[in-house]
A protein has these predicted regions:
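Sec-dependent N-terminal signal peptides
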Residues: 4-14
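Glycine/proline-rich low-complexity spacer/linker segments in large multi-domain proteins
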Residues: 126, 136-190, 243-246
Length: 312
């Protein structure tokens, strides 16, 4: 709980400026509407079969077409059965998305009512690992706080496109098939993002590579090696001003602090505000313990909203 408080506090303090300087049209919904939406999703996520298997790793590959607002995905789910004679699994995945194929250890599938039911290619017992691959495409529908959103910087259509996710608490299923419950954290995740070469694609963990493709797109790969729940898997894609610095902890360890800000926001006063993050990390570390993801990075990216969403 202490580490969780630390992470929220740093992000909220670091991103407050956006409420005043960028966003005049922050998305809002009636509390009753959001409560009803989340209640329905929570009930759907309490089905008994979610305990039949344990997810260890997600490999998420997305090709995002900004002009058509269509994403093309390929997700591999690496899992271990928790029961013997496992012959099928269910994943959470929005019905509005189209499943093109299920591969590897998957055979047949049905996709309805936001559930992707997959018949495996055999019967698996406790301790036997398997991989299910899902190829899909579609336009993700927003839900809850946001889930997956195509928009623009500052919510202004005359400014550069802005793509981002805010999947708390059950919104990950709107844009990638997964076991969308906070009780099952994957040990690690790999996220590959292909989109317009002019834009930066930001996600969890450490940058592995950036590759310019022959069709004027760029593929950016991130890897996050801490246990993570699905709603914390995130992305932010737009034209960013980027800078970084190394932060040194009292115990001698160090990690990069990485910042992605809209160019129109990157004035000297705003940059100075974000650069206060290093001091905040020191203060919170003294009170609550060392930053919990010190082996990777602390990253902060501006998006359409005026507040902040803690990821990891």
């Amino acid at each position: 709980m202490k580490k969780f408080t630390l992470l929220i506090s740093i992000l909220l303090l670091g991103s407050t400026f956006a409420q005043v300087y960028e966003n005049t049209n922050v998305p809002c919904k009636p509390i009753s509407e959001m409560a009803s939406h989340y209640s329905a999703l929570a009930k759907a996520s309490q089905r008994a079969d979610i305990f039949d298997y344990d997810v260890h790793y997600y490999n998420i590959e997305l090709d995002i077409n900004i002009d058509t607002e269509i994403i093309y995905g390929n997700v591999e789910v690496h899992l271990l059965p928790e029961v013997d004679n496992l012959e099928s699994i269910q994943l959470d995945f929005a019905s509005g998305m189209t499943v093109d194929a299920v591969t590897v250890n998957g055979a047949n599938f049905n996709h309805f009512y936001d559930l992707l039911s997959i018949t495996l290619d055999g019967s698996y017992n406790v301790g036997e690992s398997l991989v299910v691959g899902i190829q899909y495409h579609g336009h993700p529908l927003q839900g809850g706080f946001q889930a997956f959103a195509f928009g623009h910087q500052g919510n202004n259509p005359s400014r550069p496109p802005m793509i981002s996710t805010l999947s708390e608490p059950y919104g990950a299923r709107s844009w990638w098939p997964c076991k969308d419950v906070p009780t099952d954290k994957a040990d690690s995740v790999r996220i590959s993002l292909t989109t317009d070469a002019a834009f930066d694609a930001v996600s969890n963990g450490m940058l592995v590579s950036e590759t310019l493709n022959s069709d004027d797109t760029k593929t950016t790969i991130w890897e996050h090696k801490y246990p993570i729940t699905t709603y914390l898997v995130s992305l932010a894609i737009t034209d960013y001003t980027y800078w970084t610095e190394m932060h040194h902890f009292a115990d001698g360890d160090s990690m990069p602090l990485e910042y992605w800000m809209y160019p129109s926001s990157a004035t000297a006063p705003m940059v100075e505000r974000w650069n206060r993050t290093a001091g905040m990390i020191d203060i919170f570390s003294d009170y609550f313990g060392k930053y919990p993801f010190a082996e990777e990075k602390y990253g902060m990216a501006q998006f359409q909203w005026g507040g902040a969403m803690e990821h990891q």
